[in-house]
């Protein structure tokens, strides 16, 4: 038992070894998350790692997921992905924006604050959660329509 745990911990520390959640979000820094969505016709995940998770709800073209995962040091409590043709992905980070900036800088070398790159769909934008000041949102919006995040708050 302890050997398996030790092997897992060793693997997690090596550069090439990532959790399924980290693999799923590996394109976050450049918002290259094309396979991270539900198929609009079948409702099935297009990404094998996404298939591990069950959406809490699917509404208005988005699939909402609640969970407790860590993404390169960021405490993630949920995410949303498209369940239609929208190109909006969001991670809900369980820490205030000042701490989230520090954590994203440590993990990605960026505070995800470049609005121009975000508007071009080339980088995420770190936002203060308007519904919960103790949380932050990492927003990746791509595509010509530049769809905004849904007005609905993240389900508690």
Question: Which positions does each model-derived feature cover?
Answer:
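Extracellular/secretory pathway and lumenal proteins
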Residues: 15, 35, 142-145
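Short, exposed beta-strand/loop patches in secreted or surface proteins that constitute
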Residues: 53-56, 80-81, 124-130
